[in-house]
């Protein structure tokens, strides 16, 4: 299921280690293209045990996660840290992380909010698609209903805040210009779209998010970076990719999306998850 390693910008100093199945990897990857810096691409095959090997962790990242940026002898990991480092080093446009104190604060605020809301809502995608694949189940398996419901609950709650607050009166999540905050959030929805997680009737209740997602999808590099996810998740859904692709069950279980136990939405809803989902489908952002 992993793509072949590519080195499009061979011979340059920067090297990005990533895998296109990962939402944070895709946002960092797209950002490198957006600001047009020379870099080498190296796909890390996370379906194997490579990121579990001690030599990999000692050399690149003690957590074993990607993306990782290598700049000569210096290594930085975590997608936001990578993007901010590259933006500062190459004097990127101010819109990406803010031109002034207040703009920077707002973008930082969104990225921190995103990390424990939309990012954790990725459990809805993970436990319907990759989690099922890894454990030999068909996509959307009821075996993981609890995890799927936890992820979808947090996803819908986050969508409510995104619709009613962040996109209330502007085109992008932090203003009238695209920022890295948009890329981070956008690639969460790429996974949900690829996995058919959000029904059309739910999208209808979030028109601002739908318009924003369409706008981000039309950016020149969005398709290039997202194509692998759409193609391969489609194959999983059609049964063309199976668990035999993975050489270890912990593969792809390292991201934030696996920790669905952190999703605390259901206990305080005082209603069954399915009842909540029906309300969101009917009333949209007014409920979420």
From Swiss-Prot:
Enumerate the Gene3D superfamilies for this protein: 1.20.1050.10, Glutaredoxin
- What are the subcellular locations of this protein? Cytoplasm
Protein's name in the database: Dichloromethane dehalogenase
Spell out the molecular function terms from Gene Ontology: dichloromethane dehalogenase activity; glutathione transferase activity
Q: Which gene encodes it?
A: dcmA
EC number(s) reported in the record? 4.5.1.3
Q: Look at the named UniProt entry and state the broad enzyme category this protein falls under.
A: lyase
CDD domains, alphabetized: GST_C_Theta
Q: Specify the GST C-terminal domain's residue ranges.
A: 100-252
Task: Please give the GO cellular component terms listed in this UniProt entry.
Answer: cytoplasm
Chief location bin: cytoplasm
Record keywords, A-Z: Cytoplasm, Lyase
InterPro entries, sorted: Glutathione-S-Trfase_C-like, Glutathione-S-Trfase_C_sf, Glutathione_S-Trfase, Glutathione_S-Trfase_N, GST_C, GST_C_Theta, GST_Theta, Thioredoxin-like_sf
Subunit and partners: Homohexamer.
Q: What is the organism of origin for this protein? A: Methylorubrum extorquens (strain DSM 6343 / CIP 106787 / DM4) (Methylobacterium extorquens)
What is its pathway?
Answer: Xenobiotic degradation; dichloromethane degradation
Q: List the disulfide bonds.
A: none
Kindly give the Pfam families that the UniProt entry links to this protein.
Answer: GST_C, GST_N
The UniProt entry's GO biological process terms, in alphabetical order, are: glutathione metabolic process
Q: Which reaction does it catalyse?
A: dichloromethane + H2O = formaldehyde + 2 chloride + 2 H(+)
Task: Name the SUPFAM superfamilies on file.
Answer: GST C-terminal domain-like (SSF47616), Thioredoxin-like (SSF52833)
Instruction: Identify the domain of life.
Output: Bacteria
